[in-house]
């Protein structure tokens, strides 16, 4: 049975979507089968994996609201073994439409169940909010990766996210665990980055991934080409960091 990992942090611009794209590509490069679920209405994971959003006929939105078969929403990517369920801007209004649906917190869990055995890993790119779709994503997940940006206010809002995870674990998904805190945009030359690294390690200890994602221009450039960094520049620090992260997750 495939492992479902949500990537969540309601603080924006922490590298959540970038990590989803590049971790998925790295796992696939290591011959794992991967499904990325883009649960963010901005659909950046979709475009970052080369999906032409204008040509998408069935997205996560249709699966949630219209009960469309999830298999109709799965698209292949340029990487063998890496598929995606794309997002759509309509997902912005989906939370209101979901309010009257039965078992509204478990819709994503239920729609992924038929394809769970088809993949080694399912990665859910959560919206940068703690709304109903993120609650759905965490309810569906076995574990959650929390990216933490090595910049000012890095830990801002994490206590709120951890409280949400605690509530979901108590009421909706007792198996939910923290896969790890992932330090992103790390620059060892900066005192601030090292201070944040030390602070996160002190707070969360063994829950912090050994791998850190260094600040790297290739990571920033790759989405503009609709490619994960491992295809854009396999020799870059960004590609090597995400490959190391994938290996760390596989070996857990």
Tell me the role of every PLM-derived stretch.
Residues 1-252:
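P-loop NTP-binding core
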